[in-house]
Amino acid sequence: RFWFFIFDRFILYPLMNQLSQTFGTKFMNLGYWPTKESATDEQMRALVERQDLHSLNDVKVKYTNIFTNSDLDRPHYFLYERALKLHSHYPDLEGLRILDVGCGQGEGIKWTKKVHPRIGSIHGVDRCAAPNPDIIPGDAHHLPYRSRQIDIVLNVESSHLYADCEQFFRECSRVLRKDGYLCWTDLLYRSQVAQIREQALRAGLFEEHWEDITDNILAGIERTAARYDSLLMKAPSIVRLFSSSLRATYCAPGTHTHARISRGEKGYYAAVWRNN
């Protein structure tokens, strides 16, 4: 985990910040794609697909011939919606205060504001945050919020990098109001699943739903990895020096990280916990 942080903090994040102005690459999650088997995704699919995705592209994307603009980040939007849809008040989420822990560059915050305009507020916390008025630099183990302030803690594909997940769960329980929710998705070794669920329970979080969404993530990776592979081919030489590490980070087919998912060593899960 230490080396993951070093790579993210000093190599991957600076590269993403530099390249986002050229490529429009702001998300760092693997992506999610509804399949025929995921029939309960219809509400979420309709919500995403009716958005004018062009309006979210606040940077000029140089290589527009790779995909249409409306497809660029759709798998990433789907993953955010997949986490939020576990909440009982989805999709309105009216008046609720949301904290996105591990929010990266804040594109998920921007998306959530657009498609859920009736929320009370949304802010982010990230240890490697770029300058953004909606994001507070902070550590998931010590959230910079007072107790009982938040209705929803949103945690998308971030907790596997934490040194102490149980401490993160305790912090969620602290900042969440009574009956507030932690909406969570992440990639885990299957051998870790029982431990993670037990840690959340010990922290005072009651599990209301747990689901394996690995097939949808693999379908998402097919789309996101194809896009990023195309961008890497056209990237500056200094970026291509890190191609192997970058491809492993976004789990491109043919990498060891993708193989761990496809052969079942790792799974991808969505869960919602209620704060007691």
Language-model features: where?
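Conserved alpha-helix/loop element of class I SAM-dependent methyltransferases that forms part
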Residues: 73-94
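A short SAM/SAH-binding and catalytic strip from SAM-dependent methyltransferases
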Residues: 152-164
